[in-house]
Amino acid sequence: MKHIILCIHFLLMVVGLGQAQDCSVAPNMRVNCGYPTVTEADCRAVGCCFDSSILNTKWCFYNATAGPIKKLECSGDPTKRIDCGFPRITEKQCILRGCCFDSSISGVKWCYARTVITTPAPDTTTASTTAETTTVPTTPETTTVPTTPETTTVPTTPETTTVPTTPETTTVPTTPETTTVPTTPETTTVPTTPETTTVPTTPETTTVPTTPETTTVPTTPETTTVPTTPETTTASTTAETTTVPTTPETTTEPTTTPTTDTTPPTLPPTPETTTETTTETTTETTTETTTETTTETTTAPPPECAADRVDCGYSGITQADCEGKGCIFDSTIPETKWCFYTEAEAPARKAECTVDPSVRTDCGYPGITDKECREKGCCYDECIPDVIWCFEKAVPVVNS
C-alpha cells in the first residue's frame, strides 16, 4: 500500500508541474485572452495566464495548450468574417461577448465570430494513452514480491486516476461550440443605438416655445380698451389681440395693419376674414425668426459638409460629454463623425494631428483605447496598421 500511495503522489506532482509550466509561453507566441487595461483578477477568472513582467507584450494570454486552438479560431479569410458587434464597438466589449477582435486590417469587420475548431479532440486521446503507458511500469516489477503479483492491484489505480483527469481538462475546446455567438449579432441589430441617441429635436423645443408666449401675454389690456364694439363681433377683438404684439417683434412695416382694422369697424364679416389671414402670417413669421436664430448658434453643418468634420471625441462618446468639451454633436448622418469641432476651431485641430505616420512620437502604451488617448491630450488614428496610433500633437509653426 505504501508503494501505491507513493505512486499516486508522484503522479500528482507530475500533473501539477505540467499545469504550472502550462503558462510558460514565449512572449512572441502568446495569444491574447483579454482586452486593454484588463486586471489580473479578471484575466485569471476566465482561466487565462497573466504576466506583466515583460513590456510591449500581451499580459493576459491563453496557456500553451489552448493558445494554438484560440489562434486558429480567430484566423481565416478577413473577407469572410461574420459580424459579432455593432458600429464603434470597443475591443473590451467585443471580447466580453466571446468574439474575436482585430483592427489591423481596414475595410473589414473588426469584431467577428469565432471559427469552431474540431481537430484537437484526437490529440487529447493520444496524450492520455501515453500517460497510461508511462505510469504503469514504475512499481509492479520493482516492488512486488512473488506472493502478491497475481492480484495486480497496482495497474488499476493509475488507470482510474490518470484517465479521467487529463482528457477532461484538455477537451475544453468543445466549449467554443456553445459560445459561437452568431445569434447575438442578430438580436443586437445596431440601427437601434443611433435612433435612441438622435436628439436633434431638443434644441428646437427648448428655444421656440418660450419667447413667443411671453410676448403675446400683454395683448389682454388692449381688449379692455375697446369695450364699445365687442357686441358687434367677437372675432374683431381677437384680430386686435393677435395683430398688435406681432408687429413690434418682427418688423415695423405691419404698422399699417391697425389702421385698416380701425377704419371698417361697422362691417362685421370683413374682420373675420382678415383675422384668419393675419394670425396665420404672424405665426409663420414668428416661427421663422426663432428658428433662424437658433440654427445660427447650435445646429450642425449640412450633410454635404459632413466629410470635413474634425473628430473631437472618441468611440461611444455621449452627447453630454461631447457638448461638455465645447464641441458639436450630430448623430443624424451615419458613417460620419458625430462629435466634432466647430468650423472656426477645426482647421487648427486638424493641423495638430496631421503628422507623418513614420515620425509619430508615442503618447500611450500597448492596448490604449481611443478614449484614454484623447483624455491625455494626444492624437489617435487607427486607420494605418503597423504604426503608432496614439501620438503627440504637432507643434504649430507661427509665422513671424
Curated annotation (Swiss-Prot):
- Where in this protein does the record put region 7 X 4 AA repeats of E-T-T-T? 272-299
Which compartments is it annotated to reside in?
Answer: Secreted
Keyword list, A-Z: Disulfide bond, Glycoprotein, Repeat, Secreted, Signal
Repeat (sequence) residue spans along the chain: 127-135, 136-144, 145-153, 154-162, 163-171, 172-180, 181-189, 190-198, 199-207, 208-216, 217-225, 226-234, 235-243, 244-252, 253-261, 272-275, 276-279, 280-283, 284-287, 288-291, 292-295, 296-299
Name of the protein: Integumentary mucin A.1
Please list the residues annotated as glycosylated: N63
Tell me a GO cellular component. extracellular space
Instruction: Tell me which SMART domains the record gives.
Output: PD
Q: Where is the composition biased (Low complexity)?
A: 122-264, 272-299
